[in-house]
Amino acid sequence: MRQTLAVHSAPFTAKSLTDMKMRVLFQGDSITDAGRDKRNYHDLGHGYPFYAAGLIQENHPDLDLEFINLGISGNRTSQLFDRFYPDGIAFQPDVISILIGINDIWHRYGPDLVETTDEQIALNYRKILERIKAQTNAKIIILSPYLLDADDKENMRRDLTTVLPIVRELAKEFADAYVPLDELFDEALKTQPQPMYYSPDGVHPNENGAKFIAEHYAKAFASILK
């Protein structure tokens, strides 16, 4: 099974591990939002951020950790970029993760048609990552968009195959860890062949899917501490 990949992580100093609070910020769309209370940015919702935070705290009891979830349901890459200063840079996180992109594809076919090209997705994502690098010292974890098998989403699956290489290349350039969720789910479905086990619609994870993402998120987090 393919493992979560560390990219070009530089180690945290001993001081940052032991003498200060480490702020971890989750960013993305509905998969990250997961029903969080938007009046309280410490509310992690009921999706993978909640389970990932629990695993990270369990695995790293020596760290003083603060978790923030600012995912917003329905967001495309352009919308995430537009709000990224108040919902990202302003918090000056030590670790920031991003899971975005599936809505850019979905809106090509949904009732509110928005034609976002692959080139626009790449540019929006690049601008977000450049902003993180220029205006924070945060470690970056990128999680790829994914789509589990669903008969009504064949066009989306075809489009995703051209978006995934874009995200992968941006991760190589900017990220400290990359989580190839689409590949990881594909591998998992070889032994658990029912996509409904992880998601009722191929996109939004149920509890099993959220825990699956969280497990690989926690591995990525551990890799950037080395």
Description of each model-found segment:
Residues R2-S73, Y85-Q92:
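Serine-esterase "nucleophile elbow" of acetyl-processing enzymes
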Residues H8, T18, Y51-E66, Q79-K226:
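Alpha-helical cap/lid subdomain in secreted, periplasmic
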